[in-house]
Structure formats: structure tokens, C-alpha cells
């Protein structure tokens, strides 16, 4: 049980996909201007990452390894992610048309979000079992969502702050992301390896 708790906390804080592994930076920078959009993107990404991790583990364990088709792993995972994203897009369109319009192009771009593919590939490379894969996908997504919401809150405050002209816009956003990354590095002392 403590292994699962360590995996959960470690993936969210210590090995955060955005601030430590630098995966998923496109939606991190692109959707982080309004809190509602960031929360919606975080929820959609959480759903996709968790479901894609589970499906990727199942396909790898039951199809690719038994048939000795491991060389098709990346292609198979990309196809799985595309199917899961299309399913998510249909669900969001039916349940929340406003969120669907707010997310715009970023919802289909979850397909190309390298964090989603990274979670699926890392699950296999780390030798996770089914529960660990599901938990790892969920924790990575929670970490992604947490960082995105925090970053969005900071960006909203910076939008009304008196920032010097050369630092306005993306410049201060990148500086803020770097400072957040440094802050999250402090969590690495929580886990002794």
C-alpha cells in the first residue's frame, strides 16, 4: 500500500511531467490564460491519460508481447491515444458545449500531447503492473492539472500586474514556469532512494 502512495505522491510532486520531465508544455503554455479553460483541459487530460495508460498496458500485455510485436509499441499507443481523445471529444461536446468551444483546438491536440504518450511508454519501461499503470497515468494527469491550474492562477495575476514591457506575455510566463520548476525540485528531498 505504501508503494502505491509513494507512486501517487512521487508522480504528482517529485516527477511532475511538466516541471520535471518537460512533457506537455504545449497545452501548459497555450491553455493557461483562463482558469476555466485550464481546469477543463486538466479534467480532459486526466481522463485521457488515465484511460490511455490502462488501454496501452492492456494492449501491450495481451497483444504486442504475446505476438512479439513490441516494435509496434509506439504506433499502437499513438492509435490508442487518438481513439481515447476522440471519445473524450465526443463526451465533452455532448456534456459541455461551452467548455468544448473554450478548449477549441487544444482538445484534439491532446492526441499529440507528448505527456500522454510519455506516460504510456514509461508505464511499460518501468515495468508497472495493471494497478500501477492506472495509478501512474492518473497521478501524472493530476500533477499536470495541478501545475496547469497553479500556473494559470499566477498568469491571471501577472496579467494585471505592473510587469516591465520587455517581460510581458510569454517572457514572464516562461520565467514563472522556470521558478515553479525550481520550487517543485524542492520536493525531490521528500523521497529517499
From Swiss-Prot:
Topology with respect to the bilayer: Multi-pass membrane protein
Entry's transmembrane regions: 5-25, 39-59, 63-83, 102-122, 134-154, 171-191
Keyword match Translocase: yes
Keyword set, alphabetical order: Cell inner membrane, Cell membrane, Electron transport, Membrane, Translocase, Transmembrane, Transmembrane helix, Transport
GO terms for biological process, alphabetical: electron transport chain
Localization terms from the record: Cell inner membrane
InterPro entries noted in UniProt: Ion_transpt_RnfA/RsxA (IPR011293), NqrDE/RnfAE (IPR003667), NqrDE/RnfAE_oxidrdctase (IPR050133)
GO CC annotation, single: plasma membrane
Main location: membrane
EC number in record: 7.-.-.-
Source species, domain of life: Bacteria
Quaternary structure (record): The complex is composed of six subunits: RsxA, RsxB, RsxC, RsxD, RsxE and RsxG.
Purpose of the protein: Part of a membrane-bound complex that couples electron transfer with translocation of ions across the membrane. Required to maintain the reduced state of SoxR.
Similarity comment: family membership: Belongs to the NqrDE/RnfAE family.
HAMAP family: RsxA_RnfA
Protein name: Ion-translocating oxidoreductase complex subunit A
